[in-house]
């Protein structure tokens, strides 16, 4: 059995993010992992295998802890935010490693939750979810979209679509405060992309 290099500091439920899901934010101190990783990365393939193995251990550990605690009703899906104190790599690379780790896991920790990785920030997530106007507007638009799009299809591509829109706006120099106004004028991603390419 591999040594566990993660330090799970706290597990916090973030309310009001999504009505059909319970979101658990798991703060994970990555300093021990990263110091070990510096040694492992001498050989790139063994470094990747090391991270994948460690992610599998973390996913199983966190999933078991969450399942032992009350508060995940059967009618709601579970989303687990692995919130790392330090990333070392980009979020995109961590997502690739996470996907590879999940592919190698069998059992309830793989099928019982959706996972995503973020980096710890000083922002209070609960307060952000309750007060941020852009997030609240996004949730309202998301509810409307849910009524017109098959839910499984929407979930599979949600992160990709957000990233495409965000990159498109940044590439075209659109300020954050104009996002909502521009998005309200378009009904799908294709028409938005076409408008920016004209």
Curated annotation (Swiss-Prot):
Pfam families: Spo16_C (PF21698), Spo16_N (PF19225). Keywords: Meiosis, Sporulation. GO terms for molecular function: DNA secondary structure binding. One of its GO terms (cellular component) is synapsis initiation complex. InterPro entries: Spo16_C, Spo16_N. Necessary for efficient spore formation. This is Sporulation-specific protein 16. It comes from Saccharomyces cerevisiae (strain ATCC 204508 / S288c) (Baker's yeast). The gene is SPO16.
